[in-house]
């Protein structure tokens, strides 16, 4: 009787083993591999990455009519180490648009001190042509050469309505390049 029980246990063990071996056939696992191989672009010079630009201090009486502008301050962006294959880049200045003039950059309380000027926004200009660069709109190809480049722009205040009021006139502007 003892031999019969051992025999039955051995048969049961091999039966279970056979079931697991039969079920453990090859499994196929699907993996998706992705990434990019891109040409070397350019680097933004450290001194250009975080800039504090003082446009100036102006009397509010200079902004009593709509579309009045201040003198401009330079905004230079140094681009270094551009690869030989880079011929240019599309440029995008982005930020919060002014509600009355959406092509202009809205003043924002960057320091939390309040007392914001009203009826005034920041206008971005191409330094060479003096043409406005609309905020949040990609500008077509800006030529770049291999090596180092300086992109030259200007910023100025522009009144968006008659009767602007004085105060804090700070704003935050972002800059992006899409290489060609």
UniProtKB/Swiss-Prot annotation:
Keywords (alphabetical) are:
Signal
Which Gene Ontology BP terms does the record give?
cell adhesion involved in single-species biofilm formation
- Matches recorded under Gene3D superfamilies: Fimbrial-type adhesion domain
Pfam families recorded: Fimbrial (PF00419)
Residue ranges of the TM segments: none
What function does this protein fulfil? Part of the elfADCG-ycbUVF fimbrial operon, which promotes adhesion of bacteria to different abiotic surfaces.
Share any extra remarks: The operon is cryptic under classical laboratory conditions, but is functional when constitutively expressed.
User: What's the protein called, per UniProt?
Assistant: Uncharacterized fimbrial-like protein YcbU
Its gene name is ycbU
